Amino acid sequence: MAAQRTYLAIDLKSFYASVECVDRHLDPLTTNLVVADASRTEKTICLAVSPSLKSYKIPGRARLFEAVQRVKEVNAQRLQTAIRQQKAVRGEDGKYHFASTSFDANTLNADPALGLSYIVAPPRMQRYLDVSTQIYKTYLKYVSPADIYPYSIDEVFIDVTGYLPYYHMSAHELAMTMVREVLYNTGITATAGIGTNLYLAKLAMDIVAKHIPADKDGVRIAELDEKSYRYLLWNHRPLTDFWMTGPGTVKRLESHGIYTMGDLARFSTYGEDRLYEIFGVDAEILIDHAWGYEPCGMEQIKSYKPSTNSISEGQVLTCPYPNDKAKLIVREMAEILMFRLTEKKLVTESITLEIGYDRENVDKGGYRGLTQTDRYGRIIPKAAHGTVRFDAPTNLGSTIINESAKLFERITNPALTVRRITLNANKVTPDEGIYQVDFFTDTKKLEKEKKLQQAMLGIKNKYGKNAVLKASSYEEGATMRQRNAQIGGHSAGGTAGGSDGKLQK
């Protein structure tokens, strides 16, 4: 029987927001701040919300306008308090307003008559990557790279089994030691979970730690094994709080009367076959997790590779684009996709394009076609979707860019304005340098194009992505130059300082 292992899961608390607070010499736990690109309009997603602002029921991935609206609601209540305490100021128009505001939670709690304000910090992705790297190096002072798995920019899994006897520490003590050093070096607070497998470590961090008191620095560390998991979480709701249990899965479970992990565990004792009928091979994972089991360890997750691969480009446009300008964006995205395939030495069998139309097409009253509902319950035209398959796998720009443009023309309604574009390269495989040829194929021309792509890629890698651009990228509405300066679709920003940002009242 294999020896029981001990895993840590560590999550940096509101990471992007915390970095912005620390760089401004502000307390990440008490400063009201959101990370969002306000220049993209209030529909932009908040990449992070500070803990104190979350306490006003603003979710971590809200749209900026949702945060704005919630703050207005809070301030409406606070203004009534200020009026009752005779601390509000009456303007010339006879309306009351706050005498002062604050973005600090402690100050706001001390004086309920103050208005709630907050900082909107533009994202600086390069800075976040730099801080994440610094924190990763802190972990490496205690464990080997072989025993740590970066799950995301702000979250890691660590197998600490062999280190506990070495350091003469418990898992809790080792976790606290690492988290304290991260806090000392960066000013960023972390939450940790300890488990007898990766799944339980993740749940200890995501669910259990959120319901225990924090220490004076805001640090929370929780532990789970199979027994305590069943005791603490078998009746926990909603099921979407559990790792790898999404809304679609939960909906199907609930249709069979399964509302908790305890329900699922009990159902599996007599209805296992039915679970496999519903979920296929994924039923095995669901059943294991219901009982608190997770067979995969550090070696397995590090060696995992998806069985099928695709590469995608997507963007939400800052405003509604007319059809001709949207086509320009599709060509730019296809070019980016081509360079990504070239750099990775991959080819694709087909591309899929999805076009999301703007709601103004319906709001204006002239649209009579098929519709769908967006996440906010608004009626919008039904998205356009299509795929084109190539004669042979390719990464040549002449094929990918031109075929993407033709596909756009074929599937879109030219009268409608566009807001979302997603382009996927499907079934990508290693480029073996083989062409499907016939009597009319100019193989020398194909080789020349491939060498040109590689040369352009070399220039971009050395001098920056904007070193070589097509003239079309300078046309009005083009986004490639801006996107080339981004990381993950968001501004790379500066590397330090954090002086930019707007105070919102």
What do the predicted segments below correspond to?
Residues 1-288, 295-298, 443-505:
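Gly/Gly-Pro- and Ser/Thr-rich, intrinsically disordered tail segments characteristic of DNA damage-repair
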Residues 2, 9, 241, 247-417:
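DNA-contacting surface of Y-family translesion DNA polymerases
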Residues 29-31, 349, 384-386, 419-421, ...:
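A generic structural signal for short beta-strands and their flanking turns/coil linkers
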Residues 153-156, 347-362, 424-432:
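Core structural elements
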Residues 156-162, 384-391, 435-441:
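Short, hydrophobic beta-strand segments
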Residues 190-194, 349-353, 419-421:
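A short glycine-rich, hydrophobically flanked beta-strand micro-motif that places a catalytic Asp/Glu
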Residues 363-367, 433-437, 481:
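Short conserved micro-motifs at the rims of enzyme active sites and ligand-binding pockets
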Residues 405-461:
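C-terminal hydrophobic structural anchor segments
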